[in-house]
Amino acid sequence: MSIFFSIRFWPAAISAAILWLPQVLGRSNGTAPNYTVEELWKLETTFWDNFLYPANVEQMEAINSTLFTQDVQGRVDITRVFNGSELNTEYIFGLFSDPDHVSLVGVPVDYSITQFIAQGNIASATTVVTFNATSFGNLLVPVTIDTWIMWDADGRIMQYDATFRWFGFLLDTLVEALAESINGTTSQATASLTQLLATTICATHDQYCTGSNQQYDNNTACLDFLTSAIPLGKDYELGRNTLLCREVHEHMVQYDPALHCPHIGPTGGDYCVDDQTYAQKVLQKYFNQSWIVGVPSTGDIWLGD
């Protein structure tokens, strides 16, 4: 299926699918809903259909996507946890919805589910998503995303856990592509990427982070901090005090400056900060519902208090 066909066809088809799902899928028996595997497959593919560009634009414009419950919980291994439908709508759909804006991976244009198993109201899947990295000469890059998703009785996502597989390899590939395009070394490409991301973040700051939301004294101070005071970041540091973390949050500033401006500022807000050790990251108690199916979940250390 071509991208051009998708642009014409998907919005209407996806909207119809979203309206249809809650009417026909499994209902709650008083506890967790018990969907068939076919129904869970439909819920899974509906999410990924909406994740692709330009369908994700429609989801982003909804502010609170109907694909999520109001109190949805989400965790992404390379970043952090995200609470609530509005925040998840911004990060899941808004982050990858503008092909003309500087970004690491651009916009998602296709996907293939390569692994899938489901029971009750939970599905575990591996999805290879093709991104058009528009900031890297429209380089098409496959990105492998492992997900656990849990739905409520109305077919809405109530919690998810996502892992970007081989993300370090992906970052190296993007830097190598940039090095080739500028006919330079990987060190020169890394410096060029750092400057590009910092310039973009500071331009966004100057436009949206004004008045009480201002984080830097001026553009020069912003560039100095982002290029000299913090590292670019490793593949697992998109939720730490790095430039890559601020690149992620820069996309969200336009939607809610009061919330997101601190994330691109010197303090990092409560997202781009070094507040967790490795063990704290791994052992973080977070989810309201256990991912364990069919047997007692006693001893599940990820369950929130």
UniProtKB/Swiss-Prot annotation:
UniProt keyword Protein biosynthesis, yes or no: no
Keywords: Glycoprotein, Signal
Keyword Signal: yes
Signal peptide extent: 1-26
Highest taxon of source: Eukaryota
Residue positions the entry lists as glycosylated: 29, 34, 64, 83, 132, 183, 218, 288
Stated family: Belongs to the bfoA family.
General function of this protein: Part of the gene cluster that mediates the biosynthesis of aurasperone B, a dimeric gamma-naphthopyrone. The first step in the biosynthesis of aurasperone B is the production of gamma-naphthopyrone precursor YWA1 by the non-reducing polyketide synthase albA, via condensation of one acetyl-CoA starter unit with 6 malonyl-CoA units.
The protein's name: Aurasperone B biosynthesis cluster protein A
Organism: Aspergillus niger (strain ATCC MYA-4892 / CBS 513.88 / FGSC A1513)
Name of the coding gene: aunA
